């Protein structure tokens, strides 16, 4: 079942509005201190299921696109971000080979079924330039068990292995897989000082203690 735009508005507001400022600060650190290794300032980037724009507002890129169905998203996006207000598994309004990177955070598990996941992977690959990357961050059900279903709009259960396999089936080349990266959610977690967030990112051994989200970096083949 796909959530309607009105339902998404209610879900986002209930779940994220209270921590919006904190989330923005965390993503400033994540984008500049970690994800910038794959996304250069001259890149054209699309944020898939962008939410309130925490990633796309903070990443340094020449051209920024965002895609989401939530009708509230425009009020949260920076002025340099162009929004596609649509179902991410429907055809994208972009030409082939136009994107350097597609990023998604906690998105694929919200799609209604695995066929929608496949359609989205195909559209991302079509729009990526040869050598362009799909960077996917998401909850790893392997390490979550029942907590995965605490969010009403989680429909598709994924691990780093299953989503990585889906990417390979669609023709991507896996460059990096991190089974445990970030903690599960900021929704119910304490708001830690930013110095601790920076420390966590800098010490990968902490990921294996606290991380319950996977990170996958996959590339569109160059030939």
Predicted regions mapped to residue ranges:
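Conserved N-terminal segment of class I S-adenosyl-L-methionine
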Residues: 1-95, 101-105, 121
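Helix-to-beta-strand junctions that scaffold the AdoMet/dcAdoMet cofactor pocket
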Residues: 40, 111-112, 128-130
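A short SAM/SAH-binding and catalytic strip from SAM-dependent methyltransferases
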Residues: 101-115
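A short glycine-rich, Lys/Arg-flanked "PGG" loop and its adjoining helix->strand segment in the class I
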Residues: 118-130
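Conserved beta-strand signature within the Rossmann-like core of class I S-adenosyl-L-methionine
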Residues: 131-138
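Short "lid" loop at the C-terminus of a central beta-strand within the Rossmann-like core
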Residues: 139-144, 180-183
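Acceptor-substrate binding/catalytic loop of class I
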Residues: 147-165
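A C-terminal cap/extension of S-adenosyl-L-methionine-dependent methyltransferases
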Residues: 165, 176-223
